[in-house]
Amino acid sequence: ITEAGFGSDLGAGKFLDIKCPTAGIAPSCIVLVATVRALKYNGGVPKDKVAEPNLAALEKGIVNLAAHLANMQKYGVPVVVAINRFPQDTQEELDYIAAYCKGRGADFALSEVFAKGAEGGVELAQKVVEAVAKPSAFRSIVAGCGSIRERLETIAKTIYGAREVIYTPAAEKALRDILALDPAMDGKPVCVAKTQYSLSDDPAKLGRPTDFAITVRDIRLSNGAGFVVALTGDIMTMPGLPKVPAAQGIDVDEKGDIWGLF
């Protein structure tokens, strides 16, 4: 079981297109996790209003879930949509999502582990057990791509829904420098660093953006890890930290004892 964080266009994509082919493994099922409030946010509701019932916004924002679902189904593996239920979610909203998913060939389950503990995860677990028993034919979407550019374009157009990929002069130079080291580098997998808030490289473009370009501002070689990193937007490759990282509460006294560890 692998938890591939961020949106499915990022975490799941890297697991399915980099790790699985490299390790020679294939998933038996994909669990796509969403929340009612996030879908309403994608439907235009301000963050401080997402807990309020709003079926109209849900109907507008569900195109985001539809895009992620369609993307995961391209890998040839059964998909289960799991909704992390919040107390404010209405039955009408949950029923709408369930019907929407089933109409698109995906199983649906509620996850209520936070409120009910292990009991709240039984429904989802049962759906996953049923899904892994179904036939599947996993295939990476970049299988057969012969170059870094081709892999980037396939990911951008097939998963993000982009119109094209634009390279800045810095990215063009970086790619030339990488290939100058060894032309075989063109066979490296591509790890895209992109915002998790949008299918595009612009976090303000919610829902299901269309007719947009993905701009690659730089390309870096992570040769030890075995891939190249394509940087888009202003995303950082460092792990996300809170405004006050836990490290600020850690200290070492004059005796060499460490304080503030969890």
For the regions a language model picked out, list residue spans one by one:
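P-loop NTP-binding site
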Residues: I1-V81, R85-E93, A99-F262
